[in-house]
Amino acid sequence: MNQTIKVKKKKKTITLGVVHIRASFNNTIVTFTDIQGNTISSASAGGNGFKGARKATPYAAQVTIDKASEKAKECGLKTISIRIGGPGAQRESAMRALFGQNFVVTSILDVSSIAHNGVRPPKRRRV
């Protein structure tokens, strides 16, 4: 009789990490990484059941932060640095949700890209 031996995979304990928040006009994407940039956990508003215009709401950003931080806390993450980017209205509520998760925040960086006369904007809408 063949016996299978179950080997439990040892979970990495990472105490210091970076939170990348991308708040676009259409969605919110949150990624927890370690210092090297390896992903610990990630979540998006669309992946949490929000569809259409509801993905871009501050409440959807809150729920997304809660889901992603839940997985990150299982890995032992305690101290974070926040990097937030994008023009979305849900930036502020995403930050407030992170502060409510009892992480020690070391720094907050705004990594939004600023166009220096880049691409031509879309034509004006006529209704």
Curated annotation (Swiss-Prot):
Keywords carried by this UniProt record: Ribonucleoprotein, Ribosomal protein, RNA-binding, rRNA-binding
InterPro entries per UniProt: Ribosomal_uS11, Ribosomal_uS11_bac-type, Ribosomal_uS11_CS, Ribosomal_uS11_sf
Biological-process GO terms, alphabetical: translation
Superkingdom of the organism of origin: Bacteria
Keyword rRNA-binding included in the entry's annotation: yes
Functional summary from the UniProt entry: Located on the platform of the 30S subunit, it bridges several disparate RNA helices of the 16S rRNA. Forms part of the Shine-Dalgarno cleft in the 70S ribosome.
Assembly behavior: Part of the 30S ribosomal subunit. Interacts with proteins S7 and S18. Binds to IF-3.
Full protein name: Small ribosomal subunit protein uS11
Source organism per UniProt: Rickettsia prowazekii (strain Madrid E)
